[in-house]
């Protein structure tokens, strides 16, 4: 632990004890949010968005997709696809998809979500995490380039902070759109994305609702998340030890922000759900309530038996939960329950859609019954923000290697 992190640990040990005895106050929550941002080097204030528009297309009947990019740390850019209903109206709810390891805006559940929820009347943003898609030096997907261990250890804190910054900038981008209701912005995070969203949802009060799937089972010292991928999860999570009971503190901050759902398959061995079980979540909810001094706003947890790692935000139960929080203009609970479903393994074969072989099995993504039907298989050329020539000119502002160089140049001994 660095000097700054050690100071935070001492400072917050007393504050955690105060929160336990008095209930978490707005002042204490503000201190925690500020400390999380400082620890992970999340800029405060965030960089100017400097939004650039790169064209649009219609991926499906009644749906428009915009190619955009926005700024993140060090004047770098995040390429994104933004889906919305073709018939424009003001004050729409909005949704952000936060990918799992190896995922990006090209992966099936990202664009499926975009089309699905645009049909519901929402604006949906999908983007490339650092090291994937158009932020990869070879413009490839599924590379997991950011998993390469970078020294010193502070680089892990900085990478976690970059991922949080990317997501916070997505929230800011949506909140300034004329067609988005800034009070109805939600995000859904899958696997690695569940961790990124767990942290972001604790500090970004612009988010109204959060859905964590294939994860969200934040545990204690030397648990699954401390020992998971070090650069994007393990080191960032360990660095938040100053919070004391990290899971309870993070979810208490969620409760003060808005509703949160954690949704998992009970056989999800990817993120160790079987070794946690339902009782783990019951206990965590109790600890959050104790920290808050009330059960109001404590996160919800739900499960599906006999299945493993899946992006459940494209399924009926999560869509119904989102409908209650966002009030989709073109859906009701009754229309959601009446919708057909799509067997993903059959759909990817029929449409020629790529899926990570590690997750293609029936107990994982392949067996998922996604809400809706008739979602097309979109191509890489459709989902690219830049042409190859444009990307070659822009890549210095996009790729992981540039970020590593810029981040390392900012490291000081005391950090």
Which stretches of residues belong to each language-model region?
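Cap/lid segment of the alpha/beta-hydrolase catalytic domain
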Residues: 90, 96-165, 222-224
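Loop/turn elements at helix/coil->beta-strand transitions in domains of secreted/extracellular proteins
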Residues: 91-94, 120-123, 182-184, 205-209, ...
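Alpha/beta-hydrolase-fold catalytic nucleophile elbow
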Residues: 128, 188, 213-214, 263, ...
